[in-house]
Amino acid sequence: MKPLHTPKPAQIWVDADACPAVIRDILFRAAARTGTALTLVANHSLSTPTLPHVRAIQVPGGPDAADDAIAERVAAGDLVVTQDIPLAARVLEAGATAVGPRGEPFTSNTIKERLSVRGFMEELRGAGIATGGPSALHARDRQAFAAQLDRWLAAQPRPPL
C-alpha cells in the first residue's frame, strides 16, 4: 500500500554568487552520482553541466537577491551551501541544513554568536578599521566540505528500487 503523501526529496541550494568554483565542481559530481536536485542561485549568469537535476536560477542584481530567492524556496530537510550568515540563520529557521564552502556547519547552537561576530566586524569596518577577508581555500577546506556533503547525502532517504 502506498503512503498517502510521498515527501518531496530534499535538494541542495547554492548561494552561488560567492561559491568557489572548486566547491561547485564537488557539488556537480555529487549531484551526478546521486541524482540529487541541485540548484545554483546567483545574480549573474552561471555555467552548469547538462544534467537533468542541475539548474541555475539568475536573479536580478541587488543586495541579498540570491539570498531572498533561496530563503523563499528552501524546504525543511534541504541543504544550503552559503557563506552568508544571515541567510544561514533563515535556512535554519526553515528547518533546512546550512553549511559553508569550507565545510563548517551552521547550527542553531552557533548561529546567534556568528551573527553577533558578523555585526561587530561590520561595525569595525564602518569605523574604518581593516578586518581582512577570509583566507584562501585549501585542500583541507575542500575535504571538510566534501565530508559534510557526504554526511548529508548519506542521511537522505533513498527511493525503493
Curated annotation (Swiss-Prot):
Any matching Pfam family: DUF188
Superkingdom per UniProt: Bacteria
CDD domains documented for this protein: PIN_YqxD-like
InterPro entries, per the entry: UPF0178
Coiled coil, from the record: none
Family per record: Belongs to the UPF0178 family.
Name this polypeptide is given: UPF0178 protein XOO2722
Lineage of the organism: Bacteria, Pseudomonadati, Pseudomonadota, Gammaproteobacteria, Lysobacterales
